[in-house]
Design a protein with these regions (language model features):
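Active-site-adjacent structural elements in enzyme catalytic cores
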Residues: 1-178
Length: 178
Protein backbone atom coordinates (compact mmCIF):
# COMPACT_ATOMS: atom_id res chain seq x y z
CA UNK A 1 0.00 0.00 0.00
CA UNK A 2 2.89 2.34 0.62
CA UNK A 3 3.69 2.30 -3.08
CA UNK A 4 0.29 3.84 -3.84
CA UNK A 5 0.84 6.69 -1.40
CA UNK A 6 4.43 7.14 -2.57
CA UNK A 7 3.19 7.52 -6.14
CA UNK A 8 0.37 9.88 -5.10
CA UNK A 9 2.86 11.99 -3.12
CA UNK A 10 4.95 12.51 -6.27
CA UNK A 11 7.60 9.87 -5.52
CA UNK A 12 9.50 11.82 -2.86
CA UNK A 13 12.99 10.69 -1.86
CA UNK A 14 13.78 9.54 1.66
CA UNK A 15 11.22 8.52 4.25
CA UNK A 16 10.09 11.85 5.76
CA UNK A 17 6.95 11.78 3.60
CA UNK A 18 5.72 8.77 5.61
CA UNK A 19 5.20 10.93 8.71
CA UNK A 20 3.49 13.79 6.85
CA UNK A 21 -0.29 14.23 6.83
CA UNK A 22 -2.06 13.47 3.58
CA UNK A 23 -5.50 14.33 2.24
CA UNK A 24 -5.54 11.19 0.12
CA UNK A 25 -8.09 8.62 1.22
CA UNK A 26 -8.36 5.28 -0.54
CA UNK A 27 -10.95 2.68 0.40
CA UNK A 28 -10.14 -0.72 -1.04
CA UNK A 29 -11.84 -4.03 -0.62
CA UNK A 30 -11.78 -7.49 -2.08
CA UNK A 31 -13.05 -7.74 -5.62
CA UNK A 32 -16.32 -9.60 -5.77
CA UNK A 33 -19.94 -8.94 -6.65
CA UNK A 34 -22.25 -9.34 -3.63
CA UNK A 35 -22.79 -12.98 -2.75
CA UNK A 36 -20.13 -14.29 -5.13
CA UNK A 37 -16.57 -15.52 -4.60
CA UNK A 38 -13.57 -13.22 -4.93
CA UNK A 39 -12.49 -12.38 -8.45
CA UNK A 40 -8.88 -13.51 -8.87
CA UNK A 41 -7.95 -12.59 -12.45
CA UNK A 42 -7.46 -9.05 -13.77
CA UNK A 43 -9.48 -9.61 -16.96
CA UNK A 44 -12.29 -11.21 -14.96
CA UNK A 45 -12.31 -8.21 -12.58
CA UNK A 46 -12.53 -5.73 -15.46
CA UNK A 47 -15.48 -7.69 -16.88
CA UNK A 48 -17.45 -8.69 -13.76
CA UNK A 49 -16.97 -5.52 -11.71
CA UNK A 50 -18.00 -3.02 -14.37
CA UNK A 51 -20.52 -0.68 -12.78
CA UNK A 52 -19.49 -1.74 -9.26
CA UNK A 53 -15.90 -0.54 -8.90
CA UNK A 54 -14.88 3.11 -9.26
CA UNK A 55 -11.30 2.11 -10.05
CA UNK A 56 -9.12 -0.99 -10.24
CA UNK A 57 -5.78 -1.84 -8.68
CA UNK A 58 -4.35 -4.50 -10.98
CA UNK A 59 -1.17 -6.51 -10.62
CA UNK A 60 0.82 -8.96 -12.74
CA UNK A 61 1.05 -11.42 -9.85
CA UNK A 62 -1.68 -14.03 -10.11
CA UNK A 63 -3.89 -14.87 -7.15
CA UNK A 64 -3.82 -18.65 -6.87
CA UNK A 65 -6.28 -19.27 -4.03
CA UNK A 66 -9.40 -17.21 -3.30
CA UNK A 67 -9.35 -16.24 0.36
CA UNK A 68 -11.55 -13.57 1.90
CA UNK A 69 -10.77 -11.54 5.01
CA UNK A 70 -10.91 -13.25 8.40
CA UNK A 71 -13.33 -11.80 10.94
CA UNK A 72 -12.42 -12.22 14.61
CA UNK A 73 -13.62 -10.90 17.94
CA UNK A 74 -11.16 -10.15 20.73
CA UNK A 75 -11.79 -12.05 23.95
CA UNK A 76 -11.40 -10.57 27.40
CA UNK A 77 -9.15 -12.32 29.89
CA UNK A 78 -10.19 -12.55 33.56
CA UNK A 79 -7.19 -10.54 34.72
CA UNK A 80 -7.01 -8.39 31.55
CA UNK A 81 -3.32 -9.23 31.04
CA UNK A 82 -3.82 -11.14 27.80
CA UNK A 83 -6.89 -9.29 26.58
CA UNK A 84 -7.61 -10.04 22.94
CA UNK A 85 -4.83 -12.57 22.45
CA UNK A 86 -7.19 -15.52 21.93
CA UNK A 87 -9.55 -14.54 19.13
CA UNK A 88 -13.05 -15.89 18.63
CA UNK A 89 -13.40 -16.62 14.93
CA UNK A 90 -16.54 -15.35 13.27
CA UNK A 91 -15.07 -16.17 9.86
CA UNK A 92 -11.81 -18.09 9.59
CA UNK A 93 -10.06 -17.18 6.34
CA UNK A 94 -6.96 -15.22 5.29
CA UNK A 95 -4.13 -15.70 7.75
CA UNK A 96 -5.77 -18.59 9.59
CA UNK A 97 -6.41 -21.29 6.99
CA UNK A 98 -5.43 -24.01 6.65
CA UNK A 99 -3.86 -23.79 10.13
CA UNK A 100 -5.02 -26.96 11.91
CA UNK A 101 -7.16 -27.17 15.00
CA UNK A 102 -5.88 -29.90 17.31
CA UNK A 103 -8.36 -32.67 18.18
CA UNK A 104 -8.36 -34.85 21.28
CA UNK A 105 -8.51 -38.15 19.41
CA UNK A 106 -7.24 -39.71 16.20
CA UNK A 107 -9.81 -40.89 13.69
CA UNK A 108 -10.51 -41.57 10.04
CA UNK A 109 -9.86 -39.01 7.32
CA UNK A 110 -13.11 -37.07 6.91
CA UNK A 111 -14.28 -34.46 4.41
CA UNK A 112 -17.15 -32.36 5.80
CA UNK A 113 -18.84 -30.24 3.15
CA UNK A 114 -20.71 -27.68 5.23
CA UNK A 115 -24.15 -26.21 4.72
CA UNK A 116 -25.92 -24.19 2.07
CA UNK A 117 -25.39 -20.77 3.66
CA UNK A 118 -22.06 -19.38 4.91
CA UNK A 119 -20.34 -22.51 3.66
CA UNK A 120 -16.90 -23.68 4.67
CA UNK A 121 -15.45 -27.17 4.52
CA UNK A 122 -13.35 -29.19 6.94
CA UNK A 123 -10.88 -32.01 6.43
CA UNK A 124 -9.97 -34.14 9.42
CA UNK A 125 -6.60 -35.85 9.16
CA UNK A 126 -5.42 -37.77 12.20
CA UNK A 127 -5.74 -35.50 15.21
CA UNK A 128 -6.04 -32.30 13.18
CA UNK A 129 -9.03 -30.51 11.66
CA UNK A 130 -8.31 -28.19 8.73
CA UNK A 131 -11.03 -25.63 8.01
CA UNK A 132 -11.19 -23.98 4.63
CA UNK A 133 -11.55 -20.31 3.95
CA UNK A 134 -15.03 -18.78 3.92
CA UNK A 135 -16.87 -19.90 0.78
CA UNK A 136 -20.26 -18.29 1.35
CA UNK A 137 -23.74 -19.17 0.14
CA UNK A 138 -24.00 -21.92 -2.47
CA UNK A 139 -26.77 -20.18 -4.39
CA UNK A 140 -24.91 -19.47 -7.64
CA UNK A 141 -22.65 -21.28 -10.09
CA UNK A 142 -19.56 -19.25 -9.14
CA UNK A 143 -19.88 -20.22 -5.46
CA UNK A 144 -20.42 -23.89 -6.31
CA UNK A 145 -17.32 -23.78 -8.51
CA UNK A 146 -15.41 -22.18 -5.63
CA UNK A 147 -16.55 -25.01 -3.33
CA UNK A 148 -15.25 -27.57 -5.83
CA UNK A 149 -11.91 -25.70 -6.18
CA UNK A 150 -11.57 -25.55 -2.40
CA UNK A 151 -12.22 -29.27 -1.89
CA UNK A 152 -9.73 -30.20 -4.62
CA UNK A 153 -7.07 -27.82 -3.27
CA UNK A 154 -7.39 -28.76 0.41
CA UNK A 155 -7.32 -32.51 -0.28
CA UNK A 156 -4.27 -32.02 -2.53
CA UNK A 157 -2.19 -29.93 -0.12
CA UNK A 158 -3.00 -32.30 2.76
CA UNK A 159 -2.29 -35.29 0.50
CA UNK A 160 -5.36 -37.20 1.69
CA UNK A 161 -8.27 -39.12 0.27
CA UNK A 162 -11.31 -39.04 2.58
CA UNK A 163 -12.51 -42.29 4.12
CA UNK A 164 -15.80 -40.62 5.09
CA UNK A 165 -17.71 -37.70 3.59
CA UNK A 166 -20.17 -35.73 5.71
CA UNK A 167 -22.80 -33.59 4.00
CA UNK A 168 -26.28 -32.25 4.49
CA UNK A 169 -28.99 -34.75 3.59
CA UNK A 170 -31.11 -32.18 1.75
CA UNK A 171 -31.31 -33.57 -1.80
CA UNK A 172 -31.18 -30.14 -3.47
CA UNK A 173 -28.10 -28.73 -1.74
CA UNK A 174 -25.04 -28.45 -4.02
CA UNK A 175 -22.76 -29.85 -1.30
CA UNK A 176 -24.87 -33.03 -1.29
CA UNK A 177 -24.01 -33.66 -4.94
CA UNK A 178 -20.28 -32.90 -4.79
Amino acid sequence: HLLLWHEAAGRPSGTDWLAEASDLLLVMTSANPHGEPLVIANDEALHRLTGIADAYLLHDRDIVIRCDDSVVRATPDENQENWGQTPIFLRRARGYVPVPIQLADDGPTVLALGGYLKNTICVIKGREAFLSQHIGGLDNAAAIGFLEETVTHLLAILDVRPELIAHDLHPDFPSTHL
